[in-house]
C-alpha cells in the first residue's frame, strides 16, 4: 500500500516541546541536551529515540479508509463530490474514533550504539513487569472442583445424604441400637456425588490440558543492544527503551519505533486483517500509530524479505502494547453460559422439581398415613434418589468429550467441552475474511493479454492452470513474470510441493514466482539462462520494478528489458502493445480496452500489475554496454505493453462449499473484516456469502442508474457495510440491518465494532459463532457464543479468547463442527430420554410401598446400581448414534423454543415408556413372590407384618411360616428381580431410543456397534451383581433363577412395538395431534 | 445470550403463569384448549386401560401356572424357623423379664400362652385324626373330606405340666416357667431321616457366669416332634393342620440374674448355624426372674 501519508502534526517523527517530567522522567538538562542534539543533522536520525508514553484508549483499524478511497479515485476519475465529502467526514471520524492522547515525553535519550545499561534495564523490568501478556485469569482449580461437587443434582443428593445422617442421629438418640442402614445410604450417596464430581472434574481438566499444551510457545528471543553490546535475551525481558534488532522472519518482540530499516515489510494481518504486508521504514508518515510506517507492533511478524534488517527502540511492552490492550479488551468481555449448559440447567431444574415435589407430596401422604416421621424422611430420600439420574451428568460429560475427541480428529479442537454443542445451535456465523475464508496468501487470479481476460487457478495446489498458453504474448508475459522478480525459493525444498515452498520475497513476488514455477518449471534455471545485468527494485515513488537481462538465445545479442508495476504507470511508458505475439501501436481503442480490463479486475478486489518489455537495440546497447541503475542510462519509455495480471488472496477452495452447507443448514454467514469493502465484497461473492444473484443497494443503483437513496431497500438482499457507516448506526438500525438482509458483509471494522456486531446478532436471539485469527478478532471471539480461532495462522490472543480452534484453519471444519454439534444435541436428547424413562420404574416401588403396603420391591442401593451400573455404558453408547436424517438440512434450533428436554420428552419417557417399564418390573417381582408362596393379592398391606423383626412365623399362602430373615432374603430376591426387570426393559428402551422418528430398522440395528457393547455391559453387570456378588448381603442382591431374567421380555417387546407405532404415526401424519404430542 | 438472562420481575412471572393457566386469546388452559384436554385425557385413559388390562392378563397367566398345593420354589425355606411363646421382644431379640412376687409381671405372659394354646383345645382339633405312628405320615391321595388330606391331632394336654390345664400359671409362679417352642411349617418338609426332631435347651455360656447346666423338663417327653406330623401338605390340603409343639419347663433358672437360654432343634435336616438368621432352627432368649 502506498500513499496516504499525512505529514501533519509530526507527532511521531519530530522532536517535541518538552512535556512535564513524567514519573520516570529524566532530569530536564538531559532533555535539553537531547533537543540540541536533535538540531544537528547528523543526530537527527537518532532523535527519535524517545520514550513515548501514550494512552491509546480506543483502537481502530480504519486507518486505511482514506487511502482506499484515494486508490479508488485513481482508478476511476469519475468519482464525484460526495465521495470527497465522505472522505473529509471519514477523516474526522478517524480522529474522533482514535481519540488519541499522545503525550510524549522525553524520558531519556540514548545512543543507539550504547543501548540501555543492564542495571537500568533491570530497574525498568522490575518497574514495568516482563514483556509478556498477562494470561487471562484462571479460576482456581479448587473452585472448579467444588463447582462440580455442588453443581447439578449433586446438591440434591447432598441434601439426601445429610437427611440420612440426621435421620440416623435421631434414631440413635432414641435407640442406640438403631440399624446403620441410613448411615450406609447417606455415605453411599455422598460417595456417589464425590465420585461423579471427581469424574466430571477430571474430564474437564483433561480437555483443558490439551489446550494448555497447545498454547505453550517456544520462548521468543530478541537481539538487544545493552551495555554497548549485542545480546540475545528472552523477549520477555525486554523493557521500554531497549534497542532491538529485527531481521526478516522474526516476530516483533514488542511495540517498536523503528530507527532504521531496510526493505522491511510486516505482516499486520493479525492486528488489522489486511493480508498484504505493510512496508516499514524509519520515516514517520502518519499521526495514527497504527498507520505510521515507523512503528511495528508486538506479535506481528517481519516478512521473510531479502536482506531485511531493522533497528528500533521498544516503546511499549507487555500489556501496554496495542496487542495487549486488545487482549485486555477481550478479557473484559464476560464469559456467557453456553447453550448446552443452559439446557442442562433447565433439565436439572425439571428433574429436581419433579423429584422434590413428588418427594414432599409423598412425605405428606406418609405422615398423614401415620407413618413415623423418620420413616417418612427415609421415603423422601428414596424418592429423591429414585428420581435423580445420578449417572446422567457424568454421561453427558463423557458424550461431550467423545464428540470433542471426534472433532479433534477432524481438526476442530474444542477448548471448552460445552462448546461442542454450541456450533450445532449456531444460527449466525460472523466470519473473519483473511486466513479464515481466504488462504492468506496472494495468488495470481486473472491475466489479461491479447485483449482477453484469462482465469488462473487459485485453488490451494494451483496445479491446474488451464488457460490458453499458446499465444506468443503469453510467452513474452511469462518471461517477464519469471525474470522481473526478486523472490527466490529457499534452497533444499525440491521435494516440497511448489505452493508450500518457503519463499524469500514479498507476497506478490512470491505469488508470481510460484505461478511461473508451476507453469514454466524451474524459474531459477530460466533466470540463470537469462543473466540479469541490472535491476531497479520496486519503490513507492516510481511504482515499477525493472531489470535488464541477456537473452537465453545465443544468436540474439539484444538485451531484454522487463518491467512490472502499477498498470497505469506501465501503460504510460508504452507506445506499443503486443497482441498475439505481435507488436501493434497502442491506439486509443487499445488503451480503452486496457482500462476496461483494469477496472474489471480492480472491481474484483484484486491487485493488478502491468507488465511490459523492450528488446534494447543491439547496435545502441552492445554486449559490453555498462548499465547503471542510478543514472538509468537506458530507455524507459516507448516500451511494449504485454499484459496485466491480477492477484488476490483467494478463498480457500473448500469455503464456497462450506458456506453453501451452512446456508442449507439455516445458518446465516456474515463476513466481518478489517479489509477494504471492495476486496471484502469480491471475496464474499466468490465464496457465496453474497450469492450470485443478489445485489446490494449500491449494485441496484448502479444497474438502474439511479441514486442510492432512490433504491427500495427491500429489493436488495445483500449489504456491504463499512465501519464508518456502522459507527453512525443506532442499535435499532443495526438490528434492522441484521434482520432484513440475509447476506451481509462488514468491512473496515474495528475490534469494538466486531463486538457490536456480535452483540447485535445476539439481540436477534441468535447463537453466534465468530471465526477469526487476528488479535483484533479476540474481543468478538470472546463475546460470541462460540469463538472459533484458527490454529495455524491464529494469534495467541485469538486462541485464548476462542472456545474452539480449527487446527487446519479450514472454514469447512466449522461445518463438521455444526454437524457434530447438532448430532450430539440429538443424541443427548436420546440419552436423557433413555435415562429418565427408568426413573418411573424406580419411583413406583416406593409409591406403591407407601400407599399399598407391598413388601418393598426395590431398595435404594439397588437403584444406584441401575443408575451408576447397568445404565452408564448404554447411555454413553447413544452418543455414537448416527444422525437420523440429514441434520444439515434443517434450521438451527431456536434456543428458547427447542429445548433439550421438552414437555413431550418428559411426558413420553415418564408416563408412557416409564410406566410400561414399571409394570414389567412389577410383573417380575410378583412372579418371584408368587412362586415362593406369596400371591400378589396377599402382598397388599402386608408391609407392617412383613417388616416386623418380631414376627418370625409369618404365614404365606401355602401356610408356610417365614422368619424375619427369610422374608428379608426374599425381599432382596425381589429387589434383584425388579432390578433385572428394569434392566431387561432398559435394553428395549435403549434400542427404541436410537431414533426419534425413523423406524429402528431403517436406522439399522447393528450400525452402531457401541449400542451392543452397551447392551452386553448391561447384562454382564447385572449377571455379576446377581451371581458374582449375590452372596454379599450388604449389596442386597441374590442369585436370581435363570427364568426370571426372561419374565420382562414380553414387556420389553411391547415397549419396542409401542414405540415403533409411535414413530410410524409420526411419520404418517406429520403435524398431527399425535406428532405434536408424541415427538420429542 | 443476554436475552436469556433477563431477570423477570415477580409480577411478570405471576402474569405469565396466569396466562399459562388461562389464556383468554386461545381459550387454552394449562397450555391446551378444553377439547385438546379431553382428547389427551381420553388417550391416556385408553392407554392405561390397555396397559392395566395387559398387566392383569399377565398376572392371571402367572396365577394359572402356580400349583395351589405346593409352592414352585422353596429354596428360601430350606430349614424351618423356630419361635417361642411367650414372645416378648426387647431391644435385641426375645427378652422375658418377670417378678415372681408380682403376678402382674407374669400374668400377661401366661395369658399369651393360654391364648396361643387355645388353638390346641380338643374342640379346635376336632377335625384332625389321632396318630400313633412313629414314622412320617405320607399321604399321596386326598383321603379326607372336601378333597383334603388328614392332619394329626395335637392337643394342649400333650404338654402335660405346661398345658396350663394342671398349672394355670405355667410354672411362672414358682420360678420354673414353661416355654412353648414351635417349629415353622414348610410344605413337604421332612426334618430328619428316621429319628424325630428334638428340642434341646441350654444356657448360652456367658463370660463371668458360672452356671450349672440347665435342667429342663420337656413335654411331650424327650422334647420330640413326632414324625407323624410331617410332612405338611400346605394350607389347601391340610386346612386344619396345627404345628406340633414342645414345651420346655426350665427347672433351675437362677433368680435375679439375666441368663440367655438357647433352644435348638436337633434334626438331620434342620440347621441352626445360619449366621444371618437368629431364628433358623433355634431360638434364643434372655430370661430374668426376680424374686
Curated annotation (Swiss-Prot), chain B:
Extracellular membrane side: 58-291
Glycan-carrying positions: 99, 103, 130, 146, 161, 193, 222
Post-translational modification: N-glycosylation is necessary for assembly and functional expression of the pump at the plasma membrane.
Consequence of changing residue 146 to Q: Loss of pump ATPase activity
Keyword Metal-binding: no
Residue numbers spanned by region immunoglobulin-like: 194-291
Stated consequence of mutating residue 21 to S: Has no effect on pump ATPase activity
GO MF, one example: ATPase activator activity
Subcellular location: Apical cell membrane; Cell membrane
Consequence of changing residue 178 to S: Impairs the assembly of an active pump and its targeting to the plasma membrane
Primary residence: membrane
One annotated GO biological process: intracellular sodium ion homeostasis
Annotated membrane topology: Single-pass type II membrane protein
Annotated phenotype, changing residue 131 to S: Impairs the assembly of an active pump and its targeting to the plasma membrane
Family: Belongs to the X(+)/potassium ATPases subunit beta family.
Known role: The beta subunit of the gastric H(+)/K(+) ATPase pump which transports H(+) ions in exchange for K(+) ions across the apical membrane of parietal cells. Plays a structural and regulatory role in the assembly and membrane targeting of a functionally active pump. Within a transport cycle, the transfer of a H(+) ion across the membrane is coupled to ATP hydrolysis and is associated with a transient phosphorylation of the alpha subunit that shifts the pump conformation from inward-facing (E1) to outward-facing state (E2).
Record note on domains: The C-terminal lobe folds into an immunoglobulin-like domain and mediates cell adhesion properties.
Assembly and oligomerization: The ATPase pump is composed of two subunits: alpha (catalytic) and beta (regulatory). Interacts with alpha subunit ATP12A; this interaction is required for the formation of a functionally active pump and targeting at the plasma membrane. Interacts (via N-terminus) with alpha subunit ATP4A (via the P-domain).
Protein name: Potassium-transporting ATPase subunit beta
Species this chain originates from: Oryctolagus cuniculus
